[in-house]
Amino acid sequence: MFHGGSSGDRANDAGRKISFRFGLGLALVAGLGVTGAARTEAADDVSFMRQVAPILLKRCSGCHGRRVSEGGYRLHAFTELMSAGESGEAAVVAGKPEASELLRRITASDKDLRMPQEDDALAAIEVALIKRWISEGARFDGRDPGRPLTSQLPPRQHPRSPARYPVAIPVLAIEFSPDGTQIAVGGYHEVTIWQARTGKLVRRLPKRPQRIQSLVWYRPDQILVAGGTPGEYGEVALVSAMSGEVRRVLGTFDDLVLGAAVSDDAKRIAAGSAGHETRGWSMDATQAAWESRVHSDWVTGVAFSADGRFVVSASRDQTLKVHDAASGALFTTYNGHRKQLGKFTGRFAVYAVSFDKRSKRLLSVGEGKAIRVWDPVQARSENGTAADMEGRFFKAGHTRFIPHGFSKATFGLDVHDGVALAGGADGVVREFSVETLETRRTYEGASDWVYAVAAAPTGALVAASGFRGEVLVWNRADGRLVTRFVASPGR
């Protein structure tokens, strides 16, 4: 399941060595701006992370972020902020605001020099905060000066959703409750809970990220919620399934979190983002146990192996990376979606991954005509070394293929007890046997792209959601449609 991505205003200004023009770049942090800063008492030092970083990220990172660096200057991390651009002029000189190019540019009267260009100047209180922070020694009060600032900022304070949605919104994530009687649905700044058989709204869990990409209802009273705002912000949090109380924000990201997972023993959590990043946590830890950036494109999904040994991340870069669940160390790379020989050849983005407890195999899917069924240990063995490259090229490999019959990309995948559910841009949901590789049933009724599929833990129901905001629930025994509803309160 995926949706989202990065954005940036890449206006061209090659003649300027350091510019701080406004762009719709990486994260801005709602609720942490100048209003709170204005309340800071004069006796207190200015906090870089709480007061200065949100201003710089909001107004400057579109042209000076990790992906775009006008004038050779970046400020997405503190070490980059403190470095000079192509001009060689120090952006920040600790204790000397008058010698700092950053302050000179944001206060310049010449419109060709003042930054951000082609946008309103920074407010006087914002300029004063930055100047005071430099005067006080330009101290860093985050965790790691080399890490992106957006991954270290305090979690956002999210707004409430409208009481009634003016329009239906796409539903990108669904999940059954452990007893199979309710369905959690990703909404706009909220998670909504519905009766599975009637489609009746039960309750709303408010003040969540703008877009909900992944839900894991792993115990009756708690849901793992992941999402964010495309190109700006990502978040993974543990939320009460009853009240919506946020019990813990595990981490923030510099882009949308597209997938999250909980290990079967509920001791570990993993997540992946559109910022090419994968992270792992211990359930009781306050910080991530590991972080990995081994993908070259969006991380679209993650899954744990049944024994908890591995975390597997799927990506638009056409690979799946197998990580050690405890340390994050790369165990192997699965290249089965870049197959060069045989029936299912091609190079395909991967949008979903799931683990089957019965066969102890991973299933992955995205573009292309088949679901891949494979094993991490065998994949590593087949990767071999450069010395046996020619031999490996002509080997069929251990991967098995489930022809899914879809003509377009597959976004949703859920696997339980030897049965795989999949759906995508064709607007159809199908059920497959992992053992026989055969199609067992087709669930019809979706009116547009399917983004997410889910099977009830009891095995009685299956569900799907998609672009038009509908959730459909079928009886698994006979494929009959039980209910369908627009999961937008008030619609």
Give, region by region, the residue ranges found by the protein language model.
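Aromatic- and Gly/Pro-enriched helix-to-coil junctions and flexible linker segments
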Residues: 38-174, 178, 187-188
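N-terminal leader/targeting signatures
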Residues: 14-18, 44, 389-390, 481
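Short linear motifs centered on Gly/Pro in flexible linkers and helix caps
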Residues: 5-9, 40-41, 313, 422
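A broad helix-preferring feature
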Residues: 32-36, 297-300
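N-terminal secretory signal peptides that target proteins for export/translocation
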Residues: 1-20
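WD40-repeat beta-propeller superdomains and closely related acidic/aromatic-rich repeat-like regions
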Residues: 141-491
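Bacterial N-terminal signal peptides
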Residues: 21-33
